[in-house]
Design a protein with these regions (language model features):
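An N-terminal-biased, well-structured beta-alpha scaffold segment characteristic
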Residues: 1-64, 167, 187-189, 193
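Short beta->alpha connector loops at strand-helix junctions that form conserved
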Residues: 1-2, 44-45, 60-72, 162-163, ...
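Short glycine-/small-residue-rich Rossmann-like dinucleotide-binding loops
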Residues: 3, 24, 46, 170, ...
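Short, Asp-centered acidic motifs that coordinate Mg2+ and/or phosphate
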Residues: 17-20, 38-40, 171, 199, ...
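Residue-level detector of alpha-helix initiation sites
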Residues: 26, 47-50, 69-70, 100, ...
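Rossmann-like dinucleotide-binding domain for NAD(H)/NADP(H)
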Residues: 59, 63-64, 149, 183, ...
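Phosphate-binding beta-alpha-beta segment of Rossmann-like dinucleotide-binding domains, i.e.
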Residues: 59-61, 66-115, 130, 134, ...
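Rossmann-like dinucleotide/phosphate-binding beta-alpha-beta segment
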Residues: 104-196
Length: 280
């Protein structure tokens, strides 16, 4: 039932054995407390912040997601956003639509040889690292958990703490969940340590970046630009970041490809089958 409301879920949830959701539906503790027959809650996507995982754990309900489905789609979006920031293609498009020809003004830069800092080297972060390495970018990585040595060797990863990564990178791409520990991970103080030409790309969760601090840093010229696919409040209609020429905004489309949607559905179906068979 794709259009089911929260009230309808509360009325019916006691009869569900398996709950499958995308990003629109939030599964709360109140719902889970009534889910007496539920064995699995499956998120067809990456983030699990719309599922109360602690409540599910307390009732021995398995919570699964399909990060494999979005891995390539999100990484490709980040790469496209970096290219657009580097060459100012979004600004050029807007200018032509407004009757302006900014050929001389839009002098870009190349990604080749630039330093890409990746915060969070899970499946998506690693996929991005491989794509960026193919463009001869230098990859700096930070994660709160150990980074796979095989991947590090493959892309020539330079491991660093967060402060060093921010100080050294020309582009910073964020791939972490939104937790208390990652809320405003990039705030005004962190941004002040970055290169004035550096650019931030966030396709993870909006609250990871302090949008007010980001706006001020870019407007004041202490940061080079940003591309955001996620926002602290969505839909982000009316965000003041839209005032800035060197900011690109997209409406949370990281996993919105035909291939990713199909793959995520297949991944979830296979995981559910394996759980029911006792394989995983």
């Amino acid at each position: 039932e794709p259009e089911i409301t929260s009230e309808q879920i509360l009325d019916k949830i006691s009869t569900f054995d398996i709950i499958i959701v995308r990003s629109r539906t939030t599964i709360t503790k109140e719902m889970i407390d009534k889910a007496d027959n539920c064995k699995i809650i499956a998120r067809v996507g990456v983030g699990l912040d719309n599922v109360d995982q602690e409540a599910a754990k307390a009732k021995n309900i398995r919570v699964i997601n399909a990060v494999e489905g979005a891995m390539n789609a999100v990484a490709e979006l980040v790469l496209g956003l970096m290219l657009s920031l580097a060459r100012q293609t979004a600004r050029g498009d807007r200018a032509i639509r407004n009757g302006e020809w900014l050929k001389k003004e839009l002098k870009g830069t190349e990604l080749r040889g630039k330093y890409l800092g990746i915060i969070g080297l899970g499946n998506i972060g690693k996929r991005l690292g491989r794509l960026a390495r193919a463009l001869n970018m230098n990859i700096i990585g930070y994660d709160g958990v150990p980074i796979e040595e095989e991947f590090s060797r493959e892309v020539g990863l330079m491991k660093a703490d967060l402060d060093t990564l921010l100080q050294s990178s020309d582009y910073v791409s964020i791939h972490v969940p939104l937790l208390d520990s990652t809320h405003h991970l990039l705030d005004a103080q962190k941004m002040s340590t970055m290169k004035k030409t550096a650019k931030i790309i966030n396709t993870s969760r909006g609250g990871v970046v302090d949008e007010d601090a980001l706006y001020n840093a870019i407007k004041n010229g202490t940061l080079g630009g940003a591309a955001l696919d996620v926002f602290e409040k969505e839909p982000a209609i009316g965000t003041k970041l839209a005032e800035l020429d060197n900011v690109i905004l997209t409406p949370h489309i990281g996993a919105q490809t035909k291939e990713a949607q199909s793959l995520a559905a297949n991944v979830i179906a296979e995981k559910i089958i394996q759980i029911l068979r006792g394989v995983i």
